Swiss-Prot record:
Family: Belongs to the bacterial ribosomal protein bL21 family.
Free-text function comment from the UniProt entry: This protein binds to 23S rRNA in the presence of protein L20.
Pfam families: Ribosomal_L21p
GO MF entries: rRNA binding; structural constituent of ribosome
Quaternary structure note: Part of the 50S ribosomal subunit. Contacts protein L20.
Protein name: Large ribosomal subunit protein bL21
Gene source species: Azotobacter vinelandii (strain DJ / ATCC BAA-1303)
Length: 103
């Protein structure tokens, strides 16, 4: 069984037992999270598509940990002016393990 959920402004295809890195949630490690915005639920040939969400469907997950992604470098360069600006960014994420899909 698989589902497509929306969290942090992004869509993720998830299956039970899968680990996933999503945008940071203010939830402690070991706690449970429920995703109510489920766009699609599939089980073999049986596929339910929401308009826009599937009624009564939810995905539960357990928070495994918090962390930061690798650094992304931003460089702004002005040609012929001897000017360069360098900036780095590391985005926070929450790692979750999908524990159940209910449709």
């Amino acid at each position: 069984m698989y589902a497509v959920i929306v969290t942090g402004g992004k869509q993720y295809k998830v299956a039970e037992g899968e680990f996933l890195k999503i945008e940071k949630l203010e939830v402690g490690t070991g706690e449970s999270v429920t995703f109510d915005r489920v766009l699609l639920v599939g089980n073999g040939d049986d596929v339910k598509i929401g308009a826009p969400v599937v009624d009564g469907a939810k995905v539960t997950a357990e928070v495994v940990g918090q962390g930061r992604h690798d650094k992304v470098s931003i460089i702004k360069f002005r040609r012929r002016k001897h000017h360069m600006k360098h900036q780095g960014h590391r985005q926070w994420f929450t790692e979750v393990k999908i524990t159940g899909i209910q449709a």
